[in-house]
Amino acid sequence: MRKIFVPETKDRTADAVVIGGGIVGTATAFWLSKAGLDTILVEARDGLSTLTTAASAECFRAQFTEPALAPLARKSIEFFEHFAENVGIPGWDIGLHQQGYLFVTDDESMIPDLEAALTQYHKLGVTDVELLTGDQVRVRFPFISTEVVGATFRQKDGWLSCHEVTQGFAKGSSARFFVKTKATDVFVDKKGVSGVQTTRGKISTRVVVNAAGPFAGVIGRMAGVDLPLE
């Protein structure tokens, strides 16, 4: 069964519609379909992950001090570490490289801040972050400036291919991914969202996920929601 394609023009129904075919929208469609919802993703461009996802630095890290963010990052990394198994595609390679993430400072007065960050990381369950002196940093990374006096480091941070992650989420999903299909309006009735008009027909639905990235404000206004985006 085709999953990523240009659909014929006709009206449809779906349990959920995701607008935007970047890594966030595609991951959302994956999890919605995994939860048993008949899901359609619509993407205006020729393919998935071709706009902001394609411009990503593609780095990931668990070194966050925000209580709401750190657990999400940690769980995401654990998912990436077993991505092929998790999406059900044996051998799918997302180019995962866990060669570490180093935060350095050349200011002695910042060392207490690094120590406080380390304490917070451990408190949030990220217990494999190290606090290094400048000399310890240069033993591992000889190219680091002699002006660096301290750093935090986590070996399991790194980078991956956002394109391959996006494609893996799509191909491992039971959702349908409509490319060259632009959302032009969002319909709302007394019960809430009722459908999405696209350049290839209307999709009746009660669930719409706005994953349009820089165009999220435009999509929001279609549904009468003014998002604070600039």
Model features per residue range: what roles?
Residues 1-16, 31-35:
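Extreme N-terminal leader/targeting segments of oxidoreductases
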Residues 11, 92-103, 128-134, 138-173, ...:
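Helix-loop-beta segment of a Rossmann-like dinucleotide-binding subdomain
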Residues 20-22, 26, 44:
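Glycine-rich Rossmann-fold phosphate-binding loop(s) that bind the pyrophosphate
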Residues 24, 47, 215:
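Conserved Rossmann-like nucleotide-cofactor binding loop
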Residues 33-53:
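Glycine-rich FAD pyrophosphate-binding loop
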Residues 57-140:
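Dinucleotide-binding Rossmann-like beta1-alpha1 core, especially the glycine-rich loop
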Residues 152-207, 211, 215-218:
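Helical element adjacent to the flavin cofactor pocket in flavoenzyme catalytic cores
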Residues 218-230:
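Glycine-rich beta-alpha-beta "Rossmann" dinucleotide-binding loop(s) and their flanking helix/strand
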